[in-house]
């Protein structure tokens, strides 16, 4: 059984995909819902029970037209319910067999998901000669100028990396990475810039992470997903905020033969397992990064933005970094330097669907984006 929470805006398409009678589709769509879930591979008995229980609380469970004939052992469906209806349905399912108790627990995690935090900008600073976006590449002098400008603009999160993680990039020697960082780290520590903003180190090397944390960085952004025991030990010693990003393989080969049986189910398992590991190391201040563009195709990236609220069930802030990435180019046909509009479109929808942190290259435009977004949120 696989459960994926859908954006309510996707209800019409989800109903058409399942294929109930047209008159039933129209009736279900008119109910006006707070929660929509796509439930896959549900046993027949559970399907029939869930249908009746959902209707009994005022919701509905859309099933394929031939489900009533009970020809198949498993069925997919779309669950539609308001928050109140879902609360009552969870109680009913909790005492039922055929896997419905597990379903109730899964639904409850979504019902209890917290509202997103006030959105924040995480500015990207790359001390690399090969970052995919040329204007984000800085030497130490230019990088320091940029940091001071960002601080004047009120930026409170700054992510600094000295090794490219773009697709097909090679893993570099940590000594090269650390040499690129040295001057920046000294300035941040000596001038106490860490009192003005939180600095994040973007690295997959434990020794580089330790070096940055010793210089008062307070966020560890490990793009390998905390795969190494060494990185976990460093995190345990310094207790930074940890950014846990979903990916597969390494930057060099992550876009080769990308395949998921079910993207959301596999990401759920990934985050659950990794969060358990981090908890064992007494690390609880965690931000989840969906890994937009990391081991994902265009359709994966777009689905993650559209149904981002699915991951709110983990009760962690969600980070999205779609800034100028290839998916935008595939849609618009534009090169990286001309992808600002596409970036803003994706990031606005990410905020609407639960993102708390946007990792961005274009600071001024995103400051304006968040101002407008917050104004809309506050408007009656």
Curated annotation (Swiss-Prot):
Start and end residues of each stretch annotated as Dihydropteroate reductase: 1-104
Record note on cofactor: Binds 1 FAD or 1 FMN per subunit.
Result when mutating residue 31 to A: Unable to bind FMN
Keyword DNA damage: no
Annotated catalysed reactions: (7,8-dihydropterin-6-yl)methyl diphosphate + 4-aminobenzoate = 7,8-dihydropteroate + diphosphate; (6S)-5,6,7,8-tetrahydropteroate + NAD(+) = 7,8-dihydropteroate + NADH + H(+)
One cellular component term from this protein's GO annotations in UniProt: cytosol
Sites where the protein binds (7,8-dihydropterin-6-yl)methyl diphosphate: 202, 221, 289, 325, 359-361
EC number per UniProt: 1.5.8.-, 2.5.1.15
GO biological process per UniProt: folic acid biosynthetic process; tetrahydrofolate biosynthetic process
Residues covered by the Pterin-binding domain: 119-371
UniProt cross-references to SUPFAM superfamilies, sorted A to Z: Dihydropteroate synthetase-like (SSF51717)
Highest rank taxon of the organism: Bacteria
Region (Dihydropteroate synthase): 105-380
Binding locations of Mg(2+): 126
Gene Ontology molecular function: any one: dihydropteroate synthase activity
Family matches, as InterPro entries: DHP_synth-like (IPR045031), DHP_synth_dom (IPR006390), Dihydropteroate_synth-like_sf (IPR011005), Dihydropteroate_synthase_prd (IPR016227), Pterin-binding_dom (IPR000489)
A Pfam family reported for this protein in Swiss-Prot or TrEMBL: Pterin_bind
Cofactor(s) in the UniProt record: FAD; FMN; Mg(2+)
Pathway: Cofactor biosynthesis; tetrahydrofolate biosynthesis; 7,8-dihydrofolate from 2-amino-4-hydroxy-6-hydroxymethyl-7,8-dihydropteridine diphosphate and 4-aminobenzoate: step 1/2
Family membership: In the C-terminal section; belongs to the DHPS family.
Its biological purpose: Bifunctional enzyme that catalyzes the formation of dihydropteroate, the immediate precursor of folic acid and the reduction of dihydropteroate to tetrahydropteroate.
PANTHER family given in the database record: FOLATE SYNTHESIS PROTEINS (PTHR20941), FOLIC ACID SYNTHESIS PROTEIN FOL1 (PTHR20941:SF1)
Miscellaneous remark of the record: FolP can complement an E.coli strain in which the two distinct genes encoding dihydrofolate reductases folA and folM are deleted.
Protein name: Bifunctional dihydropteroate synthase/dihydropteroate reductase
Name of the gene encoding the protein in the UniProt record: folP
């Amino acid at each position: 059984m696989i459960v994926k929470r859908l954006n309510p805006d996707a209800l019409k398409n989800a109903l058409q995909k399942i294929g109930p009678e047209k008159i039933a589709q129209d009736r279900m769509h008119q109910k006006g819902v707070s929660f929509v879930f796509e439930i896959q591979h549900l046993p027949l008995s559970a399907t029939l029970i869930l249908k009746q229980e959902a209707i009994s609380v005022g919701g509905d469970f859309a099933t394929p037209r031939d489900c009533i004939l009970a020809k198949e052992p498993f069925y997919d469906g779309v669950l539609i319910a308001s928050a109140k209806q879902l609360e009552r349905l969870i109680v009913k399912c909790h005492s039922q067999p055929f896997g419905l108790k597990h379903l109730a627990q899964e639904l409850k995690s979504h019902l209890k998901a917290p509202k997103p935090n006030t959105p924040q900008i995480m500015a990207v600073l790359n001390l690399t000669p090969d970052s995919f976006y040329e204007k984000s590449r800085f030497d130490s002098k230019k990088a320091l100028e940029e940091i001071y400008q960002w601080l004047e603009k009120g930026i409170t999160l700054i992510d600094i990396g000295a090794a490219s993680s773009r697709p097909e990039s090679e893993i570099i020697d940590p000594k090269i990475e650390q040499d690129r960082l040295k001057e920046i780290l000294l300035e941040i520590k000596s001038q106490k810039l860490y009192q003005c903003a939180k600095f994040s180190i973007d690295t997959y090397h434990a020794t580089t992470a330790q070096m940055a944390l010793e210089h008062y960085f307070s966020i560890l952004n490990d793009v390998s997903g905390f795969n190494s025991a060494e990185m976990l030990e460093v995190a345990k010693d310094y207790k930074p905020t940890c950014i846990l990003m979903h990916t597969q393989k390494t930057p060099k080969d992550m876009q080769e033969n990308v395949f998921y049986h079910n993207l959301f189910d596999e990401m759920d398992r990934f985050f659950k397992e990794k969060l358990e590991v981090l908890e064992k190391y007494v690390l609880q201040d965690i931000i989840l990064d969906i890994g937009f563009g990391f081991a994902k195709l265009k359709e994966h990236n777009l689905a993650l933005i559209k149904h981002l609220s699915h991951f709110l069930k983990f009760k962690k802030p969600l980070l999205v970094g779609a800034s100028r990435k290839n998916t935008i180019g595939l849609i618009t046909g534009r090169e990286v330097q001309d992808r600002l509009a596409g970036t803003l479109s994706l990031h606005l929808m990410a905020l609407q669907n639960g993102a708390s942190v946007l990792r961005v290259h274009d600071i001024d435009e995103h400051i304006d984006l968040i101002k407008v977004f917050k104004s809309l949120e506050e408007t009656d």
